[in-house]
Design a protein with these regions (language model features):
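Ligand-binding loop in jelly-roll beta-barrel domains
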Residues: 119-142, 214, 239, 248-272
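Conserved short histidine dyad/triad with adjacent acidic residue
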Residues: 58, 64-83, 108, 116-120, ...
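Hydrophobic, ordered structural segments
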Residues: 90-154
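Short acidic-glycine-tyrosine-enriched beta hairpin
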Residues: 102-120, 230-249
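A short, N-terminal "cap"/entry segment at the start of jelly-roll beta-barrel domains
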Residues: 27-67, 144-193
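Bacterial N-terminal signal peptides that target proteins for export
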Residues: 2-13
């Protein structure tokens, strides 16, 4: 069939439409999970309801891959001394947590506190409040619990940072801040590769978090955000424990409509920016 002007126009239109689909948009490859939609299981399925609850937000804790998960503990929970096969990081979302050497006095860490637990290091974990929830992150898996007798020294040392000792900066090489009242706290990693920070958004903040790399993961640690998706009027309420992810450059439109600050944990492979 001989191409006509109409056929050529149709083909050109299809090609142009395809090009627009391939260009990374403001919300391309976004994945948003509200805390209320998280699917829960057990951190140690063999122990059933005696085990802390666990929910993968990204990755798979049972496989050899990086993973971010929520873990919840009942009041009075205290583990026996144990080790893990891999290093993990923990951030308290709700309640009070203790994580230290088996002989250490209890230091209860509230919302916004951060700790690291090196692979092979003997320790116990305890929870003090009625409801206790943390975000736990690993760079490799699977996440396993092993007896203390198998302890080893992997060369790393544990860190416990109480929320009151967090250092907040309004100017940093971690992130470009172009909004009043926004501050960040460095937690781990190298800014030339993958790193983690806490971002504090003041009450009334309305703006965007712009990610530029191929990995951007954010978890609401304290407070809540209204998230506008795909440039539509539709807003998603993201309470503590909710999750945002993008794998291309993206603008994440967020609003803190609370009467208090909201804190978000960000894991990223590239410098990001916050603007109102």
């Amino acid at each position: 069939m001989k191409p006509t002007k109409r056929n050529k126009l149709t083909i050109a239109s299809l090609l142009l439409s395809t090009c627009f689909l391939l260009v990374p948009g403001a919300h391309a490859q976004d994945n948003v999970i509200a805390a209320k939609d998280v699917e829960w299981g057990y951190l140690n399925p063999a122990r059933g309801d005696k085990s802390p609850g666990a929910a993968d937000l990204w990755g798979d804790r049972t496989k050899d891959t990086a993973t971010g998960m929520l873990v919840r503990f009942n009041k009075g929970f205290e583990s026996p001394p144990h080790i893990h096969n891999i290093t993990y990081r923990g951030i308290v979302i709700e309640g009070e947590m203790h994580n230290d050497d088996p002989n250490a006095a209890k230091m209860w860490m509230p919302t916004g506190s951060f700790w690291t637990q090196p692979a092979g290091e003997d320790h116990t974990t305890a929870a003090n409040d009625k409801t206790n929830l943390i975000y736990l992150e690993i760079d490799e898996g699977p996440y396993l619990v092993k007896p203390s007798k198998e302890h080893f020294d992997n060369g790393e040392r544990p860190i416990n940072v109480h929320a009151d000792n967090m250092v907040w900066l309004q100017k940093s090489d971690l992130v470009n801040i172009a909004a009043n009242g926004v501050s960040v706290a460095y937690l781990w990693g190298e800014t030339s590769s993958v790193y983690g920070t806490l971002v504090k958004l003041p009450k009334g903040f309305k703006g965007s978090i712009k990610s530029n790399g191929d990995e951007f993961k954010a978890v609401v640690i304290k407070g809540s955000l209204n998230y506008t998706q795909n440039n539509t009027p539709r807003q998603i309420e993201l309470n503590a424990g909710s999750y945002i992810e993008s794998s291309t450059a993206a603008h994440h439109s967020v609003e803190n409509a609370n009467q208090s600050e909201t804190i978000v944990y960000v894991r990223t492979s590239s410098k990001f920016s916050v603007a109102d």
